[in-house]
Amino acid sequence: MEHFISLFVRAVFIENMALAFFLGMCTFLAVSKNVTTAFGLGIAVTVVLGISVPANNLVYNLVLRDGALVEGVDLSFLNFITFIGVIAALVQILEMILDRYFPSLYNALGIFLPLITVNCAIFGGVSFMAQRDYNFSESIVYGFGSGIGWMLAIVLLASIREKMKYADVPAGLKGLGITFVTTGLMALGFMSFSGVQL
């Protein structure tokens, strides 16, 4: 149990997808203007990561890994295309659910919801799972931990950006300039967790 807690904390804080690896920055910067929308996208990314990492773990271990189907047959060259296909299918299902049951969130996310399919944070989580050779239970913990970490980062940035609307920001830094500075400072803050040994 201690191993899973360590893996979860490492995925959320130490190896944060947005602030340690800078993955998923296009949606991270574009949707972080409003806390509610950022939280909704964070939930969507968490759900997709939490489901796609274990699903791709099964596909990788049962089909793609060297010798998984037949001894001596290595289908690992199909990793990228297969992982993206599984992610795309899961995002389409999530999009249909949001459109049906949460239309306001679906409309607020707009084009960024289908872009979760090609969000490099999602693909990064799946790739790290394969590289680090996580088993199925570790991939569940890592997927949800990575999603929670990404959601934490985008909600923190959105809340800071909402407060900065009332700040006296220099003209040259207004908009994305101050957002990049803020993101960099947040990344420095999260770097302090890198010394933690779990």
Swiss-Prot record:
It catalyses: a ubiquinone + n Na(+)(in) + NADH + H(+) = a ubiquinol + n Na(+)(out) + NAD(+). It is found in: Cell inner membrane. Keywords: Cell inner membrane, Cell membrane, Ion transport, Membrane, NAD, Sodium, Sodium transport, Translocase, Transmembrane, Transmembrane helix, Transport, Ubiquinone. The chain crosses the membrane at residues 11-31, 35-55, 77-97, 109-129, 140-160, 176-196. InterPro entries: NqrDE/RnfAE (IPR003667), NqrDE/RnfAE_oxidrdctase (IPR050133), NqrE (IPR010967). GO terms for molecular function: oxidoreductase activity, acting on NAD(P)H, quinone or similar compound as acceptor. It comes from the Bacteria. It is a multi-pass membrane protein. Its EC number is 7.2.1.1. GO terms for biological process: respiratory electron transport chain; sodium ion transport. GO terms for cellular component: Gram-negative-bacterium-type cell wall; plasma membrane. Composed of six subunits; NqrA, NqrB, NqrC, NqrD, NqrE and NqrF. Belongs to the NqrDE/RnfAE family. PANTHER family: INTEGRAL MEMBRANE PROTEIN OF SOXR-REDUCING COMPLEX, NA(+)-TRANSLOCATING NADH-QUINONE REDUCTASE SUBUNIT E. NQR complex catalyzes the reduction of ubiquinone-1 to ubiquinol by two successive reactions, coupled with the transport of Na(+) ions from the cytoplasm to the periplasm. NqrA to NqrE are probably involved in the second step, the conversion of ubisemiquinone to ubiquinol. This is Na(+)-translocating NADH-quinone reductase subunit E.
